[in-house]
């Protein structure tokens, strides 16, 4: 590595191999992979680390139940995890296992150092413990508490996962967390970008640090599957020191070969789920302070990928296995959905309907159809050879090129903030604009007039070159489709670099195109939604709720009103419904998905009047068909006499925002 080359060190959490991983784990790792691929495209020397946290009581118990040693148990699951990452095209640079000697040896060194300098001491622990979470909780942190007849607390649940806790008492080594609380707060103030999104920082300060940090139990004696404490082998090093230190042990810290550590540490970003932000922004920084090591530059706590009935969880059995989705719909479809559907810092809901819509609307209709039409027209009008570049050959070229350049900037800005959905939205807007360019230039009309031959050539070139830009911008997110696009456009690797985006007009004239298979075949919505639901175990119908026999009232309660889900939506397309003078078919962007609504407003608005308006949509209405068109909601409007106006929203609230 040259000294001038910038480095970028990115990590996922190390996953707990108590069972197969699900699509929620894939979400984190695919996001990290997109970031790693982007940084490599920008010329960085990237270290992308993932791995497995393999010790603990839960694994010890599961292995015993299966008649296996803990190591045999985790070896089998870890092999499956590595197979999954291969199937997802995860381009990790190292995979750390906490059962590896390179890790165990350094964990013991760290524990001994902290013990010798007085940051760890021996004491007794009594408190509440969740085995699945491998986490201790104070009485005040528990939820759903249970009391006996005398008012004594006898149980409760983890505030992070809802798992039950049990009372434990055992001897333990403790880490003096409280000693570093003020220093940690000062670090937060001096490094405002350390915890992202911002809301996570406020949660850490108000919920954990200001109430007073308690010293942390860092060893256990109630199980043996862990790293032994060197001077007291009846204790095993607990997860906080064992698991968190993987970020430096994987780099060779504490070993004879520290070159990677010196090159890459401190980490540029730790990617974690929001439920473990506390461990990475309080426990880990304090541990590093005690070791007198630099702190990571950023911890990004992303949201959860939820099911309609709540958090996806192995213990609940409501998980989605990504493998059947990849096998049926292709890797790129799944990677695109995961990164486009949900803003990375927010929670999102996985639904079969949204998945199929993303594939059909964004990938098959918009991207796939654009490539197919472009290649077909170049074959038809120019014998399969891309014409030479002519600047401003049509009146629409300048606007398209301007959007091409601005899209590159939008993607770069979004990626620096890990705003994957915003980056993909910008690319999607360029795809839509390029499709519109076909309608504006009307190549089929130009082809009929020999005097318009140069304009026709300019249109074909601008289409091909714009698609090239799209393909390069998609590389961090999709690992298969860009290569297929390059093959159809006949472009070589020199035109697939990020540097090639600096100047429009790079494809040489006379480049041969070659039509290929559709990038993304269009899916049968009803059939594929049903198939995905069957994979999710969703074929069972919920029992009908008992009907309320009370007489209806003109008044409603706040509970009644709260059942109505109102969200801000942007109109992205509209057209009349055939043989229905009053109806318009309207396409809405809700941020997390696109929907179609049929509305009786044709008398008051033309389709072009609606494009770009921010409207309020009722999003939890049961879908219905009106004149054969599916309507998935209702947009709000006010009326008096023969006047009607849509309820619109001012300001910059994002699509999908709840109206309260």
UniProtKB/Swiss-Prot annotation:
SUPFAM superfamilies: Anticodon-binding domain of a subclass of class I aminoacyl-tRNA synthetases, Nucleic acid-binding proteins, Nucleotidylyl transferase. Gene3D superfamilies: 2.170.220.10, HUPs, Isoleucyl-tRNA Synthetase, Domain 1, Nucleic acid-binding proteins. Belongs to the class-I aminoacyl-tRNA synthetase family. MetG type 2B subfamily. Keywords: Aminoacyl-tRNA synthetase, ATP-binding, Cytoplasm, Ligase, Nucleotide-binding, Protein biosynthesis, RNA-binding, tRNA-binding. This is Methionine--tRNA ligase. Residues 540-550 have a biased composition (Basic and acidic residues). It is an enzyme of class 6 (ligase). A motif ('KMSKS' region) lies at residues 311-315. Homodimer. InterPro entries: aa-tRNA-synth_I_CS, Anticodon_Met, M/V/L/I-tRNA-synth_anticd-bd, Met-tRNA-synth_bsu_C, Met-tRNA_synth, Met-tRNA_synth_2, Methionyl/Leucyl_tRNA_Synth, MetRS_core. The keyword Transferase does not apply. It holds the Pfam family tRNA-synt_1g. GO terms for biological process: methionyl-tRNA aminoacylation. Is required not only for elongation of protein synthesis but also for the initiation of all mRNA translation through initiator tRNA(fMet) aminoacylation. ATP binds at residue 314. It is found in: Cytoplasm. Residues 560-660 form the tRNA-binding domain. GO terms for cellular component: cytoplasm. One of its GO terms (molecular function) is ATP binding. It comes from Halalkalibacterium halodurans (strain ATCC BAA-125 / DSM 18197 / FERM 7344 / JCM 9153 / C-125) (Bacillus halodurans). Residues 535-554 are annotated as: Disordered. A motif ('HIGH' region) lies at residues 15-25. Its EC number is 6.1.1.10. It catalyses: tRNA(Met) + L-methionine + ATP = L-methionyl-tRNA(Met) + AMP + diphosphate.
